[in-house]
Structures are given as C-alpha cells and as structure tokens.
C-alpha cells in the first residue's frame, strides 16, 4: 500500500496505487486459464464451441427464470470470452472498448424489447 505523510495526497495516491496494483477479474481469469493450460492447449475454435455451450445453458436458465443460474451462465460466458479473446491475440478489455466506441453515439429506438439502431 502507498503511504504519504500528507493525508490528502495519501488518499488520492493510495487509491490510485491500489487500483493499479489490484488485479482485475479479467487478470484473475487469465491467470486461472494459464495455470490450467488453456492458452497452451486450447484454441479459438474450441473456446467458441464452449461459448455456444454456455450460451445454451444461459438461455435455459433465462427460460426457467432461474436467477442463480442466469448469473452463473453470464459469468461463465465472460470467462470463455476472456479466454477466446486471449487465444485470438487480443484482450477482452480491448474488445469491450472497441465495441463501446462503436455504439457510444449510436441512435435508434426500442422495438419489441430490443434496441434497433438507425440506419
């Protein structure tokens, strides 16, 4: 932990330092995957198939209105997407950032519960 004699600077720098040092959930997922050989023995195609499996399980949970399984399914998909991105030579953070930049200023409207972008 960062410590400075000036309490104001200590709060700001301590928070900033902690944010830099603390591993993100994505970092923890990558460490978990590395330790299990997913990046050495896996590939994009197998991770894509795993994503399809998790997608189906999440769909079933949604249809059954099973909130614990919905949470589990979404989390599982994020884990798989993190690994898929890594195996594709990018990062989940880069993918999320690129997607947000694309949609940030998008205009559209809600139709039948889905946002439809203007053409």
Task: Tell me what each language-model feature is.
Residues 2-74, 78-119:
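Flexible "arm" and connector segments at domain edges
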């Amino acid at each position: 932990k960062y410590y400075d004699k000036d309490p104001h600077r200590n709060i700001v720098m301590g928070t900033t330092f902690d944010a830099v040092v603390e591993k993100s959930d994505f970092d923890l997922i990558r460490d978990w995957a590395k330790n299990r050989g997913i990046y050495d023995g896996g590939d994009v195609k197998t991770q894509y198939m795993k994503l399809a499996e998790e997608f189906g399980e999440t769909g079933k949970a949604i249809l059954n209105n099973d909130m614990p399984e919905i949470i589990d399914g979404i989390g599982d998909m994020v884990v798989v997407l993190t690994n898929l991105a890594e195996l594709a030579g990018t990062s989940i953070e880069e993918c999320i950032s690129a997607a947000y930049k694309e949609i940030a200023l998008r205009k559209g409207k809600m139709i039948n519960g889905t946002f439809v972008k203007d053409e």
